[in-house]
Design a protein with these regions (language model features):
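Short, Lys/Arg-enriched, Trp-marked, Pro/Gly-tolerant hinge/linker segments that flank
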Residues: 73-84, 96-107, 116-165
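Amphipathic, well-ordered alpha-helical segments in soluble domains
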Residues: 6-9, 61, 85-89, 110, ...
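N-terminal regulatory/effector-sensing and dimerization cores
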Residues: 1-74, 99, 103
Length: 169
């Protein structure tokens, strides 16, 4: 049984995923998440085998990031429209393969870009989440105070402050 999350993005071909006693027929543009401690079975189609990319991840915010990107234990699959960008981030992770602090930071940076891109893609698919703020109010207040502290000599517009902290319509 796996102990990490593994996210697969199908680049071409077809295959089958079985998870939670449910069977999914997947094709290019589909993505699926395998969660820790969840049994899953998957295989490529015999006539049109898939090619996919994948990234494994773990951490105290892993489930949260996956959820904001549209993946949960109950909904482990979805379409993605940003495969080329995601592929470039996975390439970056693979290129930063040395066991060094700089490459570790590069791998983490590419993984964050990977999730940011997935989240932006998900917002396009499910527009209702665009206005959903996921941080506690105190975080927004702190960012507002930081902005004011750094710009106190300037004429501050409320709309600029709202843009900075991410709450502007």
């Amino acid at each position: 049984m796996r102990t990490t999350y593994v996210l697969h993005i199908i680049r071409s071909g077809r295959g089958t995923l079985e998870i939670h006693n449910q069977k999914y027929e997947l094709t290019a543009g589909d993505a699926f998440l395998l969660c820790p401690d969840v049994e899953a079975w998957y295989e490529a189609d015999w006539e049109d085998p898939w090619s996919y990319m994948w990234v494994g991840f773990t951490g105290y915010r892993a489930q949260e990031y996956a959820g904001h990107a549209g993946f949960t234990k109950r909904t482990p699959i979805r379409k993605v429209n940003c495969g080329k960008e995601l592929n470039s981030y996975i390439d970056g992770i693979l290129e930063a393969h040395q066991l060094s602090y700089t490459d570790e930071l590069k791998r983490n940076g590419y993984l964050m870009l990977f999730f940011a891109t997935l989240m932006e893609d998900y917002k396009k698919i499910v527009p209702a989440i665009v206005n959903q703020h996921s941080y506690p109010g105190s975080v927004y207040v702190k960012h507002a105070m930081d902005y004011i502290a750094h710009h106190y000599r300037e004429k501050i517009k409320i709309s600029e402050l709202a843009d900075y902290i991410g709450v502007n319509r």
